[in-house]
């Protein structure tokens, strides 16, 4: 098995820590909040407020299930438009109260069903991109598993984007890429090699800012590592003048 094939397999492993796992281990007094105030509460998107030591933060994440029934409830981590609208509601609330935003991303992509499209899936994603680019609080996005397409980017317009060592981030799935390029989805590993989807490759291309190592560490050690990095970077971002924070975020994405 090639290194890319191994990473692809690990990124999709059902046993990986979820967004709620990270929230409950990183933040004190974490309280989950629900609903988009328009249509429904999407189980694929979770969010709430808590304390990173003494820093009040807002957390938003895409949640995959840990077993079949949970996956059905979470729609296998594929958000509907109401999920993205819930995320935006919580992020605008964070801006109102001056709370830094931390997002955890693990999705193959936004849900492509008829109902989701009828309720404005494309608009919901585009609205998040537009609004996040100008939110007046620090934003850090962490890709903890799969980072698939616009469904992932809708929570990743951030001042810094981090990836776990065995996560992936791509415009579409390797299977989808292989199906388009060669009409053969079984060539997914070959496609993944071409797509440059691993943390190491994306860091080299400056698409992401930090890699969180996994190999040789227990999950509790990874959480502690993330916590220390978050405290350092949030304090640094909060020290910037607002104009500089927003300009840096803008230039980060313009440079692509």
From Swiss-Prot:
UniProt keywords, alphabetically: ATP-binding, Cytoplasm, Fatty acid biosynthesis, Fatty acid metabolism, Lipid biosynthesis, Lipid metabolism, Nucleotide-binding, Transferase
Task: Tell me the enzyme class.
Answer: transferase
Q: Which reaction does it catalyse?
A: N(6)-carboxybiotinyl-L-lysyl-[protein] + acetyl-CoA = N(6)-biotinyl-L-lysyl-[protein] + malonyl-CoA
Q: Which PROSITE patterns match?
A: COA_CT_CTER (PS50989)
The Gene Ontology terms for molecular function here are:
acetyl-CoA carboxylase activity; ATP binding; carboxyl- or carbamoyltransferase activity
Start and end residues of each CoA carboxyltransferase C-terminal domain: 1-236
- Domain of life of the native organism: Bacteria
Which BP terms from GO are recorded? fatty acid biosynthetic process; malonyl-CoA biosynthetic process
Alphabetized Pfam families for the sequence: ACCA
Q: Where in the cell is it found?
A: Cytoplasm
Pathway involvement?
Lipid metabolism; malonyl-CoA biosynthesis; malonyl-CoA from acetyl-CoA: step 1/1
Q: Give the enzyme's EC designation.
A: 2.1.3.15
Q: Which GO terms describe its cellular component?
A: acetyl-CoA carboxylase complex
Q: Which HAMAP family match?
A: AcetylCoA_CT_alpha
The text of the family note is: Belongs to the AccA family.
Q: So what does this one do?
A: Component of the acetyl coenzyme A carboxylase (ACC) complex. First, biotin carboxylase catalyzes the carboxylation of biotin on its carrier protein (BCCP) and then the CO(2) group is transferred by the carboxyltransferase to acetyl-CoA to form malonyl-CoA.
Complex and partners: Acetyl-CoA carboxylase is a heterohexamer composed of biotin carboxyl carrier protein (AccB), biotin carboxylase (AccC) and two subunits each of ACCase subunit alpha (AccA) and ACCase subunit beta (AccD).
Q: What is this protein called?
A: Acetyl-coenzyme A carboxylase carboxyl transferase subunit alpha
Which taxonomic lineage is given here?
Bacteria, Bacillati, Bacillota, Bacilli, Lactobacillales
